Curated annotation (Swiss-Prot):
PANTHER family referenced in this protein's UniProt entry, alphabetically: PROTEIN SLYX
Protein name (Swiss-Prot/TrEMBL): Protein SlyX
Coiled coil spans: none
Start and end residues of each stretch annotated as Disordered: 53-72
Protein family according to the UniProt entry: Belongs to the SlyX family.
Residue spans of biased composition, Polar residues class: 55-65
One Pfam family cited in the UniProt record for this chain: SlyX
Native species: Shigella flexneri
Length: 72
């Protein structure tokens, strides 16, 4: 009777392991897809930031245009 119980427990553990392996593989695929999407979004954000900077003049004068402080 104990052998049957051990066999049943072993079968249950093997079943759980197989399920976990499938789940891990599915999660791996999902994470890889998210990484690709985030890379695309970073590229788009960089391009939009560059376009925004190019289209709007800055209100801050460059250091060469700034007058020196009064103590100079």
């Amino acid at each position: 009777m104990q052998d049957l119980s051990l066999e049943a427990r072993l079968a249950e553990l093997e079943s759980r392991l197989a399920f976990q392996e499938i789940t891990i593989e599915e999660l791996n695929v999902t994470v890889a897809a998210h990484e690709m999407e985030m890379a695309k979004l970073r590229d788009h954000l960089r391009l939009l930031t560059e376009k925004l900077k190019a289209s709007q003049p800055s209100n801050i004068a460059s250091q060469a245009e700034e007058t020196p402080p009064p103590h100079y």
